[in-house]
Amino acid sequence: MTSVSLGMPAAPPPVLAPRRKTRQIKVGSVGVGSDSPISVQSMTTTPTTDINATLQQIAELTASGCDIVRVACPSADDAEALPIIARKSQIPVIADIHFQPKYVFAAIEAGCAAVRVNPGNIRKFDDQVKEIAAAARDHGTSIRIGVNAGSLEPGIMKKYGKATPEALVESAVWEASLFEEHGFHDFKISVKHNDPVIMVAAYEMLAEKGDWPLHLGVTEAGPAFQGTIKSATAFGALLSRGIGDTIRVSLSAPPVEEIKVGNQILQSLNLRPRKLEIVSCPSCGRAQVDVYTLAEQVTAGLEGMEIPLRVAVMGCVVNGPGEAREADLGVASGNGKGQIFVKGEVIKTVPESEIVETLIEEAMRIAEEMGEADGEDAVKGSPVVSVS
């Protein structure tokens, strides 16, 4: 077999814009803002009172690459569960608080890494800021000022008539000023809307008004497909301009799916190290093999590998050889056989029936070599799949 040196890039991959300069806060062990990597969050869907189920879901999220997790706290029973969850979680826990200010203090005392407060629906929130700031400071707890289009303060709604970008930003800046007035600066801000255009405009406006770390999110984004499109569109617009320090993809789907989408958005913008990527042509009348089946079988066979490896599955002679040469590993198919490329070099030609097996074997061999070089386990996570 021909020996091909894979190597690693000598310089970091290019990004579309430098990160916006912000202050840094800590959410437990995770830095948010400044030069900290952009983190990916999700929220549990289990009743917080079901401690075992909640911890199990947090473990699944952690394994999928989640950096920070949020749990709901709508009742006293939920608040009582927080100390155990915060202590046993593998990643920092944020308590999500609405309506009742007493649960903000309960979450802080429970040891949660951070608390999300909604100034639009917590009773007499402005009157509570001084005490919240003091408690958070004493316990080393950070705060997210979570402004949401669906729950703006009545005064703001009366002024603007609806949840405009200006309305969202005015609410956020006012609350930020209250915390800062009391000497508390360990907070980040979100201004969420379910319309990506309004959401992007609000974050762009907010980014000009202060150096606060920003939590990006499209609220109530919808089912998996629709929510993925909305989040990718909005996050891409902001992150490509350097705006955003932590993200949460909101989907009507299992929380693990939110992490997969969030990680892939960051990887596609070179804001997180790329993992395994399957590139496959969309197929057309020129295709001489079943590209869909080949791509699905290769993806299934490589599931669980986590290495910066691009695998191209191409179906004809037009773009096939060129695309396969550009990939780390690839196949250009035609006439009942496939040419296998590694780093631009043809290493073998195999019958069509052996393409999938050969690609998987070569990928596993490369993964082992890369794992040995890095001293790490290269088999974990899920592959990234794209269509060229």
Curated annotation (Swiss-Prot):
Keywords: 4Fe-4S, Iron, Iron-sulfur, Isoprene biosynthesis, Metal-binding, Oxidoreductase. Coiled coil: none annotated. The keyword Transit peptide does not apply. Signal peptide: none annotated. Its EC number is 1.17.7.3. Pathway: Isoprenoid biosynthesis; isopentenyl diphosphate biosynthesis via DXP pathway; isopentenyl diphosphate from 1-deoxy-D-xylulose 5-phosphate: step 5/6. Its cofactor is [4Fe-4S] cluster. Binds 1 [4Fe-4S] cluster. Gene3D superfamilies: Dihydropteroate synthase-like, Sulfite Reductase Hemoprotein, domain 1. GO terms for molecular function: 4 iron, 4 sulfur cluster binding; 4-hydroxy-3-methylbut-2-en-1-yl diphosphate synthase activity (ferredoxin); 4-hydroxy-3-methylbut-2-enyl-diphosphate synthase activity (flavodoxin); iron ion binding. [4Fe-4S] cluster binds at C281, C284, C316, E323. This is 4-hydroxy-3-methylbut-2-en-1-yl diphosphate synthase (flavodoxin). It comes from Paenarthrobacter aurescens (strain TC1).
